[in-house]
């Protein structure tokens, strides 16, 4: 055998045992286009199969040996070519050995035929004519394949819809939207923004495709198209293949260009230059993949490559900063738009063309809205792999969920201990100094009998502490005792804490027992910070030399149109930092408690530093509207506090929201009876708003709060950050609200009026009764509304009355002039129901206030009950609400 036909010594097995990279097998665009894979994909070729049958006149059967695995294949004789066999090899590797594939494998594999009669058993195949029936063909990797080839592994991306909050694995920012939020790699399962797809490194691990090499493949399983080179295939269109199963989607090969990949690998790896950074959007640490939590300065960001991580993770990040890598003349670094300030524009116009008075436009893109996620929300399943196909009997609409714009946060299971240790104290009632093991958390100060037991002597809720002051009252001290170090003042008793032994030097032994000025001062500082965990303490700045700092912490309380200066919110309310109730347009809502009365409240904390100075008036929009609203169906505003950095809006605290009630129901939807009861209350509250020319603009189940956990609860509207003052014949054009509940005129940037809220009511009725959103984003809203088969599929709409569907149809009218008003909706037969009226009257009697029904209807319903032999209760309260009579039109 000649040297040319012998396998070179440098050749190596195509599947070494130590290969760890997992990679698909793309090949260059210059490879033959008549390969086997194309024919396999359209069915004109029989797929290779494991068979023992003998070849016929029209087929050639032979064995392919790849490493330690043999595959029996059959190919049509007229289609047998060297390129076809190589295509077949690539397909087998792609499915059975993804960890051994690499970029451009097609051009770097050699085929050898086993010839047992030759001294050199392996004979290099240079033509398909050398392959005969029953031959054993060995696949060998060429010496031209380098380590670099194995390191370049492109991702196979397809458009994907996520059912849970998901973050981009490249830049760390959230994937926004309701559907088709980003791209998922079919090989490794990582998720990316579309804008990041051209920047990601070609490092697919292929873990989702990895298959045991000793498992035989079925015949049809090998009919996989050979993908083109990354430079030759554009990204998959968002409009196509979105709702196909992953196995049926055609992946798009994307990532950095190969020339850039080679350039990056040759660069010298340098350490990152980290600096503390504040993020305006939810971002995860790119090292530990956990959320960067907080209001500001949440983490560290590399100044050069924009890598994001926790402060604790910065020291663990590899020294692999790429610097300012450019692509098409633009930086490839991540997070460039996360640093941009929120751009707020003003473009409201009334019907007469005049400018709106306090109507600066909200940030137009929904992505600019700030919100924070609780880590427990990220533990759920990140996505689903399949989507139900459209059929007349099942709905293809999006299941009802808490949209990303208004994530529902849950309270943590346990408070974090802020400080613990031994401390001494006596009180204004008992001057005997006692020693206990103090433990301070975010809600209370507990005095334990010892450091390990669960028995405690006293528990002091932080909400009962009126203030912490320096030592002033020494009248209660026993004779001969050392003075105390600071005082904790509550409504009923004063705690004199610490013992000043007069020593100027630190004594560790005494400090461990709670004696000494330094240990007491550390406790004083910790308690002051715990009293107001979300803002600097005004009470800390007490010395005359700190006048400037004191002014910075001065607050103003606005309550019942009265202005009180130098009022610190921490002296009136206790804010629980670990009890996050939710997030609104401009801030986060925390649970809180009034110190003197113990009343539970909800406190929205707004960070003014995130917005331009000229837009500060917009931050007060919600407060300005709520101050003039006094209605049982609208959340009550107690007061507002303001510092130069923050605004604190104090409101009544309610039990939960309507969305939570819907999702927790047995079928994830509400019965008609309860829906009627709640929708009537919503419409009555809207009637009060519209009478005052106020349009909510962001009505959705998340903003309908429940006062209790009863089956028929009182509901109240909240979150007026988007609300607008719109006259009866006026229009606005500013971008407002949540897209899933918005009317078409807002989504199309056309003028809208108060009928905007009525469209939202229609969506609320729909999602309450069905548990799904009414529209699929893939189709035009007009077409979907006119197609009753898809708008109201039998499951579940066969169980729902035709009157409910009729009301929904009259509310979901694309033309605003045809859309029902509040009064027309309340007069609709679906809501004019005797049982609904009884439920509402029972509720009004229970709370002792009549504001939903009207006394003029009593006679009509009494006649109705008499006519139909129904019971008419006599215990209902009869007096209407005087305020309701004055305000209603």
From Swiss-Prot:
Domain PH per the UniProt entry, residue ranges: 416-532
Swiss-Prot/TrEMBL catalytic activity: L-seryl-[protein] + ATP = O-phospho-L-seryl-[protein] + ADP + H(+); L-threonyl-[protein] + ATP = O-phospho-L-threonyl-[protein] + ADP + H(+)
Zinc-finger ranges (Phorbol-ester/DAG-type): 154-204, 271-321
Keywords on record: ATP-binding, Cytoplasm, Kinase, Magnesium, Membrane, Metal-binding, Nucleotide-binding, Phosphoprotein, Repeat, Serine/threonine-protein kinase, Transferase, Zinc, Zinc-finger
Enzyme class: transferase
Compartments, record wording: Cytoplasm; Membrane
Highest taxon in the source lineage: Eukaryota
Any one Gene Ontology cellular component term annotated for this protein: cytoplasm
All copies of domain Protein kinase, residue ranges: 575-831
EC number: 2.7.11.13
Active site: 698 (proton acceptor)
Residues the record lists as Phosphoserine modifications: 27, 37, 41, 44, 213, 216, 346, 391, 395, 442, 539, 730, 734
Function: Converts transient diacylglycerol (DAG) signals into prolonged physiological effects, downstream of PKC. Involved in resistance to oxidative stress.
Full protein name: Serine/threonine-protein kinase D3
């Amino acid at each position: 055998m000649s040297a040319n036909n012998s396998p070179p010594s440098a050749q190596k097995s195509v599947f070494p045992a130590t290969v760890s990279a997992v990679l698909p097998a793309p090949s260059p665009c210059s490879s033959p286009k008549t390969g086997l894979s194309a024919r396999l994909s359209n069915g004109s070729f029989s797929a290779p199969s494991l068979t023992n049958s003998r070849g016929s006149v029209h087929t050639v059967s032979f064995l392919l040996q790849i490493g330690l695995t043999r595959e029996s294949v059959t190919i049509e004789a007229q289609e047998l070519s060297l390129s076809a066999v190589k295509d077949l090899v690539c397909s087998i590797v792609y499915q059975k050995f993804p960890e051994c594939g690499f970029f451009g494998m097609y051009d770097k594999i050699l085929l050898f035929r086993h010839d047992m009669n030759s001294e050199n058993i392996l004979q290099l195949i240079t033509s398909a004519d050398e392959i005969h029936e029953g031959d054993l063909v060995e696949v060998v990797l060429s010496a031209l394949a380098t380590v670099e080839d194995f390191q370049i592994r492109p991702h196979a991306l397809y458009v994907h819809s996520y059912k849970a909050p998901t973050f981009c694995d490249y830049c760390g920012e959230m994937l926004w939207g309701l559907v088709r939020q980003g791209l998922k790699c079919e090989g490794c399962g990582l998720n990316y923004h579309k804008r990041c797809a051209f920047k990601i490194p070609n490092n697919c691990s292929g873990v989702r495709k990895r298959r045991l090499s000793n498992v035989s493949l079925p015949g049809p399983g090998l009919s996989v198209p050979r993908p083109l080179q990354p430079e030759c295939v554009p990204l998959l269109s968002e409009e196509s293949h979105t709702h196909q199963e992953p196995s049926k989607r055609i992946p798009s090969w994307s990532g950095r260009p190969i020339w850039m990949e080679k350039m990056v690998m040759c660069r010298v790896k340098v350490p990152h230059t980290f600096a503390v950074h504040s993020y305006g959007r939810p971002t995860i640490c790119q090292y530990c993949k956990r959320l960067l939590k907080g209001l500001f300065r949440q983490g560290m960001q590399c100044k050069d490559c924009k890598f994001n991580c926790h402060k604790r993770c910065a020291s663990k990040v590899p020294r692999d900063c790429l610097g300012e890598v450019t692509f098409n003349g633009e930086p490839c670094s991540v997070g460039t738009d996360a640093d941009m300030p929120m751009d707020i524009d003003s473009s409201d116009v009334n019907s007469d063309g005049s400018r709106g008075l306090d109507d600066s436009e909200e940030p137009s893109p929904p992505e600019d809205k700030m919100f924070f996620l609780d880590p427990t929300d990220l533990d759920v399943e990140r996505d689903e792999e399949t989507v139900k196909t459209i059929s007349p009997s099942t709905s293809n609409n999006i299941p009802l969920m808490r949209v990303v714009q208004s994530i529902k946060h849950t309270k943590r299971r346990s408070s974090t201990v802020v400080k613990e240790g031994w401390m001494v104290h006596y009180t204004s009632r008992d001057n005997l100094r006692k020693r206990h093991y103090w433990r301070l958390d975010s809600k209370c100060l507990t005095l334990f009998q010892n450091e390990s037991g669960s028995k405690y002597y006293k528990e002091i809720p932080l909400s009962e502490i009126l203030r912490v002051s320096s030592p002033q009252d020494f009248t209660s001290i026993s004779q001969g005792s050392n003075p105390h170090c600071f005082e904790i003042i509550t409504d009923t008793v004063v705690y004199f804490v610490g013992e000043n032994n007069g020593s100027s030097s630190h004594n560790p032994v005494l400090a461990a027992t709670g004696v000494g000025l330094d240990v007491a001062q550390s406790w004083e500082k910790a308690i002051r910070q715990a009293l107001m965990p979300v803002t600097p303490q005004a009470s800390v700045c007490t010395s005359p030399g700190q006048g400037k700092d004191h002014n910075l912490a001065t607050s103003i309380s606005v309550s019942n149109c009265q202005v009180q200066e130098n009022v610190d919110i921490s002296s009136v309310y206790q804010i629980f930092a670990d009890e996050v109730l939710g997030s609104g347009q401009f801030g986060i809502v925390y649970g809180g408690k009034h110190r003197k009365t113990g009343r539970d409240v909800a406190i929205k904390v707004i960070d003014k530093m995130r917005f331009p100075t000229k837009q500060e008036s917009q931050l007060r929009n919600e407060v300005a509207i709520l101050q003039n609203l006094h209605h049982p169906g609208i959340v009550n505003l107690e007061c507002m506090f303001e510092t130069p950095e923050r605004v604190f809006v104090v409101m009544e605290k309610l039990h939960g929201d309507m969305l939570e009630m819907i999702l927790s129901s047995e079928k994830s939807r509400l019965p008609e009876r309860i829906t009627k009861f709640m929708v009537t209350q919503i419409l009555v509250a809207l009637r009060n708003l519209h009478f005052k020319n106020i349009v909510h603009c962001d009505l959705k189940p998340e903003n309908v709060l429940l006062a209790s956990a009863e089956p028929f609860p009182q509901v109240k509207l909240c979150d007026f950050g988007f609300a607008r003052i719109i006259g009866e014949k006026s229009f606005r054009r500013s971008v407002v609200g949540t897209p899933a509940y918005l009317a078409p005129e807002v989504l199309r940037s056309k003028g809208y009026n108060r009928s905007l809220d009525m469209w939202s009511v229609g969506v609320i009725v729909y999602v309450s009764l069905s548990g799904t959103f009414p529209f699929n984003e893939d189709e035009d809203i007009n077409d979907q509304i006119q197609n009753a088969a898809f708008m109201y599929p039998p499951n579940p709409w066969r169980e729902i009355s035709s009157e409910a569907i009729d009301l929904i149809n009259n509310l979901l009218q694309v033309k605003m002039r045809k859309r029902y008003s509040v009064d027309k909706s309340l007069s609709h037969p679906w809501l004019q129901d005797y049982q609904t009226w009884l439920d509402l009257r029972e509720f009004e009697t229970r709370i002792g206030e009549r504001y939903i029904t009207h006394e003029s209807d009593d006679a009509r319903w009494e006649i109705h009950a008499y006519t139909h032999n129904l019971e008419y209760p006599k215990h209902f309260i009869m007096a209407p609400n005087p305020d309701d009579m004055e305000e209603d039109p």
